[in-house]
């Protein structure tokens, strides 16, 4: 899953 700070891998 894409987060604000980058890709969290989920």
Swiss-Prot record:
Organs and tissues of expression: Expressed in the rhizome. Not detected in leaves.
Cofactor(s) the protein needs: Cu(2+)
One GO MF term attached to the UniProt entry: metal ion binding
Temperature dependence: Optimum temperature is 60 degrees Celsius. There is only a slight decrease in activity at 75 degrees Celsius and a sharp decrease in activity at 90 degrees Celsius.
Its EC number(s): 1.10.3.1
Enzyme class: oxidoreductase
Reactions mediated catalytically: 2 catechol + O2 = 2 1,2-benzoquinone + 2 H2O
pH dependence: Optimum pH is 4.5. Active from pH 3.0 to 8.0. The activity decreases sharply above pH 7.5.
Co-factor note (free text): Binds 2 copper ions per subunit.
Keyword list, A-Z: Copper, Metal-binding, Oxidoreductase
Post-translational modifications: Glycosylated.
Role noted for this protein: Catalyzes the oxidation of mono- and o-diphenols to o-diquinones.
Family: Belongs to the tyrosinase family.
Subunit and partners: Homodimer.
Stated name of the protein: Polyphenol oxidase
Organism for this UniProt entry: Zingiber officinale
């Amino acid at each position: 899953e894409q987060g604000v700070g980058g890709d969290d891998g989920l």
